[in-house]
Amino acid sequence: MVAGSPKTSKKTLPDLSYEDRIEGVVFGVDEVGRGPLAGPVMAGAVYLHREHIPEGINDSKKLTARRRHLLSDMLHNQADYATGMADVHEIDRINIRQASLLAMKRAVEALIQKIGREPDCILVDGRDIPDWPWPSLPIIKGDSLSLSIAAASIVAKVERDEIMVKASQEYPGYGWEHNMGYPTKEHREAIQRLKPTKFHRRSFSPIRQFYENVD
């Protein structure tokens, strides 16, 4: 683990304070989709190039869908990134925490393969670090502090949303095209009315309770 962290501030946007303390190649990693009742958990890994950093990068949750798509397109052209996913079956088998870490590891491995070198440090959103050999620094609320992590949250969110919108066409009625699988009132009521799909997480309470009541 890499020691040390910049002092906290009242800044409104993430910056390179953490990245500037580290020499060499720095990846930012974040995941999205821990809370939904349906769909995969997705992680992004981003290597920003200092001379080409899009303006306006922020925690994906603080951006509109339109802004996220715009920034994702810009990152596609101006940075190196990759995504990793753990599907519903993996979530149910190993639990959502472990599945999130697995998705992060897959994203990092994909980015290493893409750029042809390993990172000197990985900045990870949250408290947990996946089981990998690279020096890492966990940062609580990292997607609001580190540009690299914020960028990772954007690419992961955009890709996961696209998966959910596509899935909503196969399984209409659950509102996935706008709730992205999260437990909204509409989604919960649809589960009771239409029954869960193979895209739902059976280990999550509302889905598990549905099958317990059926049995």
Swiss-Prot record:
Question: Any idea where the RNase H type-2 domain is?
Answer: 24-215
Q: Which reaction does it catalyse?
A: Endonucleolytic cleavage to 5'-phosphomonoester
Mind listing the GO molecular function terms for this protein?
Answer: manganese ion binding; RNA binding; RNA-DNA hybrid ribonuclease activity
Which species does the entry assign this protein to? Zymomonas mobilis subsp. mobilis (strain ATCC 31821 / ZM4 / CP4)
Top-level taxon: Bacteria
Give the UniProt keywords, A-Z: Cytoplasm, Endonuclease, Hydrolase, Manganese, Metal-binding, Nuclease
The answer to keyword Transferase applying to this record is no
* Family classification: Belongs to the RNase HII family.
A cellular component annotation (GO) from this entry: ribonuclease H2 complex
Q: How is the cofactor bound?
A: Manganese or magnesium. Binds 1 divalent metal ion per monomer in the absence of substrate. May bind a second metal ion after substrate binding.
Gene Ontology biological-process entries: DNA replication, removal of RNA primer; mismatch repair
What does the record give as EC number? 3.1.26.4
PROSITE patterns per record: RNASE_H_2
Cofactor(s) this protein cannot do without: Mn(2+); Mg(2+)
Primary place of residence?
cytoplasm
**What residues form the membrane-spanning segments?**
none
Compartments reported by the entry: Cytoplasm
Its job: Endonuclease that specifically degrades the RNA of RNA-DNA hybrids.
Q: What is this protein called?
A: Ribonuclease HII
Q: Where does a divalent metal cation bind?
A: 30-31, 125
- Enzymatic class: hydrolase
Task: Report the Pfam families cross-referenced here.
Answer: RNase_HII
